Amino acid sequence: MENTYVGQRDYRFNVNQLSYRGIRRRKWGKWVSEIREPGKKTRIWLGSYETAEMAAAAYDAAALHLRGRGTNLNFPELVDSFPRPESSSSEHIQAAAQDAALMFKPGRLSEPALESGQGLSRVGLSPDQIQAINESPLDSPRMGWMQDLEVADYEELYGQFFGQHDRDEFFEMQQFQSIWNSNN
């Protein structure tokens, strides 16, 4: 059975491929995670997961418990968010790993919170909401705030983002008539 090992240096793989410690990809697409018990030749099976991130989070929860806070983690910014096993038994480590993996389950409304309390979030829209957005005209009342902005507001906003030099160049170019507006 051939596995794609992630986390080790192998130049056969695409340079852009994500790599995480303690995981590998099965040829049928599932990601698996396991960790070696310190001082032993045995491994603790942490599970099979849908995504690499789920498997990597499972590994991190186990590594944090077995090796301590000084160990290299896949998601070091989440060290305080990972579940802790009740004991050092393989069953408790596996349970904590499963819980950590669920933090990254696809379809969750938000990613795990970072130490600062600021996490990435996803907005889930229903098919009806997406259809309503696609069907509303660009000049609908919902877009009215754009019409309320004066030219001075645009200049100020542009200057804040791109600097004075670029702003002046941009508005200088705006004085020339666009080829799309010509009546030729």
From Swiss-Prot:
<dbReference type="InterPro" id="IPR036955">
    <property type="entry name" value="AP2/ERF_dom_sf"/>
</dbReference>
<dbReference type="InterPro" id="IPR001471">
    <property type="entry name" value="AP2/ERF_dom"/>
</dbReference>
<dbReference type="GO" id="GO:0005634">
    <property type="term" value="C:nucleus"/>
</dbReference>
<dbReference type="InterPro" id="IPR051032">
    <property type="entry name" value="AP2/ERF_TF_ERF_subfamily"/>
</dbReference>
<dbReference type="GO" id="GO:0003700">
    <property type="term" value="F:DNA-binding transcription factor activity"/>
</dbReference>
<protein>
    <recommendedName>
        <fullName>Ethylene-responsive transcription factor ERF022</fullName>
    </recommendedName>
</protein>
<keyword id="KW-0936">Ethylene signaling pathway</keyword>
<keyword id="KW-0804">Transcription</keyword>
<comment type="similarity">
    <text>Belongs to the AP2/ERF transcription factor family. ERF subfamily.</text>
</comment>
<keyword id="KW-0010">Activator</keyword>
<keyword id="KW-0238">DNA-binding</keyword>
<keyword id="KW-0539">Nucleus</keyword>
<dbReference type="InterPro" id="IPR016177">
    <property type="entry name" value="DNA-bd_dom_sf"/>
</dbReference>
<comment type="function">
    <text>Probably acts as a transcriptional activator. Binds to the GCC-box pathogenesis-related promoter element. May be involved in the regulation of gene expression by stress factors and by components of stress signal transduction pathways.</text>
</comment>
<dbReference type="Pfam" id="PF00847">
    <property type="entry name" value="AP2"/>
</dbReference>
<dbReference type="GO" id="GO:0003677">
    <property type="term" value="F:DNA binding"/>
</dbReference>
<feature type="DNA-binding region" description="AP2/ERF">
    <location>
        <begin position="19"/>
        <end position="76"/>
    </location>
</feature>
<keyword id="KW-0805">Transcription regulation</keyword>
<dbReference type="GO" id="GO:0009873">
    <property type="term" value="P:ethylene-activated signaling pathway"/>
</dbReference>
